[in-house]
């Protein structure tokens, strides 16, 4: 099995590379939940933009691979749903994967009812596209809901924040596994109840019907960097196994930091015995990331890894990047 890496992330001096937009625009109050793909010589950065009224929409920015800190905004690619829909107020946490000639955009919806906390995030929706830029909703209902695991059959809260991996089958077909966040918290003065989240996985043969949901990471009550929640599992394969960077909420900082885990099969994960798996912590006082660092998206660049993430206020200060040598 892989060992926990000693990542030496170097934060980019230009951070945040995608700050909130101009007053009155679709992302003037925040840029959050980055998900980055390389398409040819270009990076596509899908993210959640927050407008002045608090509506969240899926947006797109692009940059040349050779200039990974110089992004150009292209606006909204998926607007919120109708007033009574599960995604009537927020569309957040994009995850984009290509299935043959069709691009799938998975996103987390939040409805307009208030007072439910994490339970108002009632589904992961799907939109499709022929070019990865112009998307159309696949119906008006989520394709994944939060009540699919044996551990939490009455839960409603669910979020994306993960990845999709492809598994080749003996018959020549491809199956898919999605890593995502199970948001089981309920409104409470106890943050361990209010913000409780777990990491989960499911599988699919077509990217539409998902089954086999089960939890793969729980908060660790003895580890103060993640004794409240674990979320946003970004997973990739390496020779010898699987590696994950995920977010933890803990009493040490009160908000998100980032940690890592390793696995032989992508289902059973090793995190070490304490907080030895911490990989990125909040930045120095007064910085755009002094409060939290969260929602990792990792992409390989030759002999290094590039990490995209958001900062204070769940993206109120924008999106930044950091690089590190490939793990030995």
Language-model region placement:
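Beta-rich carbohydrate-recognition and catalytic domains
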Residues: 1-89, 97-160, 165-228, 236-291, ...
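Active-site/pore-lining binding-face segments in mid-to-C-terminal subdomains
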Residues: 232
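Conserved active-site neighborhood of enzyme catalytic/cofactor-binding cores
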Residues: 297
